[in-house]
Structure formats: structure tokens, C-alpha cells
Amino acid sequence: MLVSDYHFDLPDSLIANYPMPDRTASRLLHLDGHSGEVVHRQFPDVLDLVQPGDLMVFNNTRVIPARVFGQKESGGKVEILVERVINVNEALAHVRASKSPKESSKLILGQDKGEHIEATMIGRSGALFHLVFDEPVLDVLMRAGHMPLPPYIERPDEDSDQERYQTVYNQKPGAVAAPTAGLHFDEALLEKLKAKGVETAFVTLHVGAGTFQPMKVENVKDHIMHAEYVEVEPSVVEQVKAAKARGGRVIAVGTTSVRSLESASQSGEIAPMQGDTSIFIYPGYEFKTVDALVTNFHLPESTLIMLISAFAGYDHVMAAYKKAVEQKYRFFSYGDAMFVTRNPQAKGPQGEE
């Protein structure tokens, strides 16, 4: 199974640089995983695709303004992207500069926002730099940080992104990328789901910048996933078990919710979980908990389109993406969405199992 099997041609004009004026105004491509049938809908139609007794599981992570600009003591420009807050004053970060900062060197950050914040580079962890700040990291980011828009959105962040690159139900700060399927839900739609008898549950997965990193292998099975923090509380486990017992479906909102639930189900049955996951889901994976999912359209040759292919089958997914391009759906973080049901006989490229 090759990474190149997951390539598709996407015109730049279909990459959404801004969200729709209203959260629910996006289009929704409904893919029946079993048959491969595609129906073109509007996002509020998700109400017609769920049933009383279903459980929708959302990721309640909050995107932190993790991108900070500044300079080295030498005066050279520097840009940091905090990947993970380790403790109050320390973080692991990607650092972009003409020359990488040396150990013990200082960075002066936040001048573009009228701040003067110092951080010291005390070591490295792989590609990440270990930084110690002179004040709490989250305080620094709230004052001096910019929303970390994905690299394919080719514009500076704007004030509106502070709201629109967050879900309305975010609770726990820690992500450096939004769980984008959730961006389509507003309070009114959540209330309508509740009124229909659909239960909701919340997991936490702090999305890392690694989600945008291109795969650097040719063979899919050689790829090693980056680790991300996940939390599935005992109450969520009970909700999942109750939904299954009453014949309801577990519907994951976003690939991060899928990865959270499946990470907590590796023993064969879902159990509480708190810690890192590096689960990599691609065709051949046997889903243990998730029955349907809501997701945006993903990058060619990405781990996320592989996850969707594992869920609904490679041929069905690639055919659906082809139709989405033909119908000019909007792609990626601020784009349109899919509602996908699971195909128990899903296969990979060339019928691989």
C-alpha cells in the first residue's frame, strides 16, 4: 500500500481560506460506506442522518494561539509554534529561523503585539525545541500569540479566526490545530440534536502540528505517527456502552474523536484513557467502537484520508472525493464536510485487506 495511492488532484481554488458566514452554512457530502452511494446535502441535514438513541462524540480541545513571532539575541527573526505545554513555564516548540538557536540562547518574543517576553532554549527533543519562558506559557500565548492557521491557508491570522477557528463547545486548552469537523456545529444545531434524542459526549485530543506534516515514506505501513495527548473519561465509556446496548450508533465528530475512541478501545472494549496516543488508522484496521463519522475533506496523501478509507473503503472514498472536486466542494479546515457510515468490508487499494 503506497502513499501515492492516496493522491488526488485538487485545484487551489477549492481550498477554503475563510469559513462560511454561518457555521452551519457548509455543504455536506453523505457517503454510505457500505454501498458507496453519495448524496449531496447541506450541513443542517445532519439532523436527518442521525436517529434517537445515537451518541455523538465531540473533541472539546481548545486551540491555543500557539504561533509567536520574535527575534534571537543576535537580532535574527524567529517564529515559534508551541507544540505542547510541558508544565507552567515550559513548552516544546517548532522554531523557524535562518539558523537554529543554540542551547542556552535567549529569544525575545511578542514585540509585534507590544510585549517583551523572554524564552530560553535549554535543549531539543527530536525536531522540537525545549523552551523555558520567564512567565506562564499560556499567559504568554494569550497576550502575544497568533492563531496557528494551517500552512495551506495562505493569509495572516485575523481577529475573526479567534472565534471561527474554535468549536463552540471547546473547553480544554492545548491544541495547535482545530478539530475542524466540529466547526460546523453551532449552539442551535446542538440543541436540535438533543431535542431529537441524540446524546452527546466529549473526549479530549490536543491536536498537534504533526497533523499537517507530509508523510516521508513511500509505503504506508512504514509511517510512524506523532504522539498526541488524549483523554477519554469513565463517563464517556459508560455513554458509549449504553448507546451500543440500546442499539444506537456511536458517531464521531472528526478524525480526532475517532482516534480518541479507538485508542481507548485497543483491548477490544472501550476503557477510560489518559495519556499519549500515536494510533495510525489505515485500511486493514478493524474498528472497535465508531459506527459513523462527520469529517472535513482532507489533504491528498495524508494520514487522515487513509483513516477515512479504512472506515468506508478506499474505492468508495476516492470516488467520493472525485465527485466532491467535480461539484466544487470547499476543502480542508474551513471547508465543507462529509457524513460517512462504516463499511464492515472496507478494503484498501487494489482490494488489500
Curated annotation (Swiss-Prot):
Organism: Marinomonas sp. (strain MWYL1)
GO-annotated biological processes: queuosine biosynthetic process; tRNA wobble guanine modification
Family: Belongs to the QueA family.
EC number: 2.4.99.17
Lineage: Bacteria, Pseudomonadati, Pseudomonadota, Gammaproteobacteria, Oceanospirillales
Coiled-coil positions: none
GO MF entry, a single one: S-adenosylmethionine:tRNA ribosyltransferase-isomerase activity
Entry function: Transfers and isomerizes the ribose moiety from AdoMet to the 7-aminomethyl group of 7-deazaguanine (preQ1-tRNA) to give epoxyqueuosine (oQ-tRNA).
Keyword S-adenosyl-L-methionine recorded: yes
Record keywords, A-Z: Cytoplasm, Queuosine biosynthesis, S-adenosyl-L-methionine, Transferase
Catalysed reactions listed for this entry: 7-aminomethyl-7-carbaguanosine(34) in tRNA + S-adenosyl-L-methionine = epoxyqueuosine(34) in tRNA + adenine + L-methionine + 2 H(+)
Name of the molecule in the record: S-adenosylmethionine:tRNA ribosyltransferase-isomerase
Superkingdom classification of source: Bacteria
Biochemical pathway: tRNA modification; tRNA-queuosine biosynthesis
Gene Ontology CC: cytoplasm
Disulfide cysteine pairs (residue numbers): none
Pfam families in the cross-refs: Queuosine_synth (PF02547)
Subunit (UniProt): Monomer.
Subcellular location: Cytoplasm
